[in-house]
Amino acid sequence: MIIEKINNNVCNMDDFSNTKKHLDKILISSELLLKRVQKLYSESGFEIGVSLGSGETLKNGDILYEDENRIVYIEVLPEEVIVITPTSIKEMGIIAHNLGNRHLPAQFDEGCMILANDYLVEDLLKKEGVPYQKENRVLPKPFKHASHKHI
């Protein structure tokens, strides 16, 4: 079976947690969300091919297949990340400048910056005296290195 379009997500289902259907997860890393063409297997061994159009990506909770007995959906695995919660605008600026010079991809949440787990980043944060935490989080989108050029 090949899926070419995602029509629903478990977040849009009012009765998802109470459904009588078998919930069959496909556990993937956040990096696989970006792959438009791939073969995936659910926890029960159900095989699904994915062939999405240009610009389309998978999202956590996407339903790939549903019938009267089963819902097969994507669940993104948590990954260890570095979470920085700046205590001032100055601290935020210093952190952003230092990390930006290294062209590191970052994500932002309420009051915090999220970075891929990297010992070099940890060394920099320790050197600068910036408090951080390591957490396991499900990322809504993968870290993606953006291309750039200096003018």
Swiss-Prot record:
InterPro entries in alphabetical order: UreE, UreE_C_dom, UreE_N, UreE_N_sf
Keywords, alphabetical: Chaperone, Cytoplasm, Nickel, Nickel insertion
Chief location bin: cytoplasm
GO BP of this protein: protein folding; protein-containing complex assembly; urea metabolic process
Family named by the database record: Belongs to the UreE family.
Protein name: Urease accessory protein UreE
A GO term from the CC aspect: cytoplasm
CDD domains membership: UreE (cd00571)
Protein purpose: Involved in urease metallocenter assembly. Binds nickel. Probably functions as a nickel donor during metallocenter assembly.
Cystine pairings recorded for this chain: none
GO molecular function term, any single one: unfolded protein binding
Naturally occurring in which organism (per UniProt): Bacillus cereus (strain ATCC 10987 / NRS 248)
Pfam families the record matches: UreE_C (PF05194), UreE_N (PF02814)
Localization of this protein: Cytoplasm
Top-rank taxon: Bacteria
